[in-house]
Amino acid sequence: MKLVAIGRLKAGPERELFERYAGRIRPALTVTELAPSKGSVQEQKRQDAAALLGACPDNALIVALDEGGKTPDSLRLAEMLSRWQESGRPIHFLIGGAEGLDSSVIQRADSVISLGKLTWPHMLVRVLIAEQVFRAQAINTGHPYHRESRPD
């Protein structure tokens, strides 16, 4: 699995937390970081889209992270991840730049998901997606990390 993101995650607590979760995921969640583009908003989105899609093989199963995507709960994401993995295609999670994803990325994506209605810094989105993929794998393997219900 690969996470392809615009921007660099600097050393610090966000990177440490990302690495903590990414290191638990099997197969490993690797990262490709792409330099942010410059220009008008539309030009940035167009250039970022070309870079993001260019970092994915033609047969990639692309999961775009976008505020307009579906908002699965953890159990539903676990089902989705299982289905994606069963496809045999390499899974690529795409995170756009500050201006969001170009429509060409949304159109190419096999799935578009959102982490909710709140706006998250791009560096935290990396941590959140790594944790949720780890959680999904824990759910799918019966690991006790995820607790669906809590006693009253």
Curated annotation (Swiss-Prot):
It is an enzyme of class 2 (transferase). It is found in: Cytoplasm. Its EC number is 2.1.1.177. Its main location: cytoplasm. GO terms for cellular component: cytoplasm. CDD domains: RlmH-like (cd18081). GO terms for molecular function: rRNA (pseudouridine-N3-)-methyltransferase activity. Keywords: Cytoplasm, Methyltransferase, rRNA processing, S-adenosyl-L-methionine, Transferase. The keyword Cell inner membrane does not apply. It catalyses: pseudouridine(1915) in 23S rRNA + S-adenosyl-L-methionine = N(3)-methylpseudouridine(1915) in 23S rRNA + S-adenosyl-L-homocysteine + H(+). S-adenosyl-L-methionine binds at L65, G96, L115, G116, K117, L118, T119, W120. InterPro entries: Alpha/beta_knot_MTases (IPR029028), RlmH-like (IPR003742), tRNA_m1G_MTases_N (IPR029026). HAMAP family: 23SrRNA_methyltr_H. Homodimer. Belongs to the RNA methyltransferase RlmH family. Specifically methylates the pseudouridine at position 1915 (m3Psi1915) in 23S rRNA. This is Ribosomal RNA large subunit methyltransferase H. It comes from Gluconobacter oxydans (strain 621H).
